[in-house]
Amino acid sequence: MCTTVTVLTDTWSRREKRFEGHAKILAIGTATPANWVDQTTYPDFYFRITNSQHLLDHKEKFRRICNKSKIRKRHMILTEELLKKNPNLCTYNDASLNTRQDILVSEVPKLGKEAAMKAIKEWGRPISEITHLVFCTTSGVDMPGADFQLTKLLGLNSSVKRLMMYQQGCNAGAAMLRLAKDVAENNKGARVLVVCSEVMLSVFRGPSLQQEDNLLAQCLFGDGSAALIVGTDPRPGLETPLFELISAAQTIIPNTDSHLKLHVREMGLTFHCSKAVPTFITQNVEDCLVKAFEPYGISDWNSIFWVLHPGGNAIVDGVEETLGLAPEKLRASRDVLSGYGNLTSACVLFILDEVRKKSKKDE
């Protein structure tokens, strides 16, 4: 692989490369594995497949967590056959990183391809017109990365400009929108393929009496991929803009870094989430909104449409109550959480797709 960077004067750059208007989402595609689990029966499956049926109190606690999650089902590549073939995935702390990596490095790009093909089909333009690829996943760090593998799977031009983002978790979905906006608006004529592909095999493991937040991870996450085509200046009659990306911002809430952590270990990706996370979000969400929307004169949070990442039901409930949102404002977020679980980076793009579908129905 060869990367070449040409540096021009600022005057030339402004004349030749700048956009004519804000970036727009021109197509959306989503995909999930065919295999899925029913949340009501999942505790029985989970404790059986991990040989943990003797942990009766722990199993009942897990059942309560699942019942409160407001999740109906989740799609997963994990099947009973795969888990029986790889028993080291079913313990809590056996060394299993190699096993997980072998599966993830293959499955993440393949699932991403499914969503990308749907987005490209909706876009309706030749795949050769894609100029940039930005890809993110929480799992399966490898080199060449999932972006390179997807380039081959799709048959993209060898000159396509790629950016790979690993292990940014739920934050990555919105971050990808920001990156795609920046790329599209600073490269005249660019058509950016955005792909978020998540296979949460990395956090699957058996129960631990000492690490109770592990049960939350086993209850919450699902597999899925989402893809967008983003560009400026849609060609009339050839491209149909769905959403316009006006601005993007990111804020760090002070003193919160110890409350939500994922670490790569020999046992896979460990998950640690304190009970304070929903409170931190609800206490700070309005300040973030004020900073983002004040330049546009928007202060009525019910006057805008919402694509809230549903990190969990408590977060959705807390934001709705804190901001006084009407129930329908977060309906798309609740529907995606219910039907798919937390899809980490792909989640907000699934919700964006739900919002667009509902908008079409209401026309």
UniProtKB/Swiss-Prot annotation:
Keywords: Acyltransferase, Flavonoid biosynthesis, Transferase. The gene is CHSB. Disulfide bonds: none annotated. It comes from Ipomoea cordatotriloba (Tievine). Belongs to the thiolase-like superfamily. Chalcone/stilbene synthases family. It holds the Pfam family Chal_sti_synt_C. GO terms for molecular function: naringenin-chalcone synthase activity. GO terms for biological process: flavonoid biosynthetic process; polyketide biosynthetic process. This is Chalcone synthase B.
